[in-house]
């Protein structure tokens, strides 16, 4: 017999309250003799599900920060809370409830006045838009 599915409440947010951030891998591209990863920075507004996508040839911190700024400029504003799926660009270390954010992300958050918030480990239901 199949194990019963766990029930979840649908996430409800207000306009401008929250967005969800992640990287997506889109295979590789050939540039000259080099084969490079094609990465998409993805930010989704939780309330409207409006999506922002920007492609990069890596998933380094500079691209991660640039993706945030580009999304904020495209939308003409900054969500109050940004959810992260414990990706290394955002969370350097996590032990229980103790979270060490990447200092560069904290600097960006302080400048743009948003709250970075990681979702619980292995709880994809907490971040249902950009997964």
Q: Positions of the model-derived regions?
A:
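Substrate-binding beta-hairpin/strand module that engages nucleic acids
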Residues: 80-84, 89
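Mobile-element integrase/transposase regions
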Residues: 1-51, 59-63, 67
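RNase H-like two-metal-ion nuclease catalytic core shared by retroviral integrases
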Residues: 84-85, 95-96, 114-131
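Short, solvent-exposed loop/turn segments at secondary-structure boundaries
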Residues: 55-56, 93-98
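Short small-residue beta-strand/loop micro-motif enriched in glycine and branched aliphatics
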Residues: 49-54, 90
């Amino acid at each position: 017999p199949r194990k019963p599915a766990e029930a979840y409440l649908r996430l409800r947010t207000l306009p401008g309250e929250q967005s969800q951030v992640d990287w997506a891998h889109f295979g590789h591209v050939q540039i000259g003799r080099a084969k490079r990863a094609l990465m998409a920075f993805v930010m989704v507004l939780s309330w409207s599900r409006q999506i922002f996508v920007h492609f990069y040839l890596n998933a380094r911190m500079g691209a991660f920060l640039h993706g945030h700024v580009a999304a904020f400029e495209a939308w003409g504003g900054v969500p109050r809370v940004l959810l992260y799926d414990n990706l290394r660009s955002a969370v350097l270390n996590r032990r229980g409830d103790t979270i060490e954010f990447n200092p560069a992300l904290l600097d960006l958050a302080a400048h743009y006045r948003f709250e970075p918030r990681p979702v619980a480990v292995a709880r994809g239901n907490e971040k249902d838009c950009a997964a």
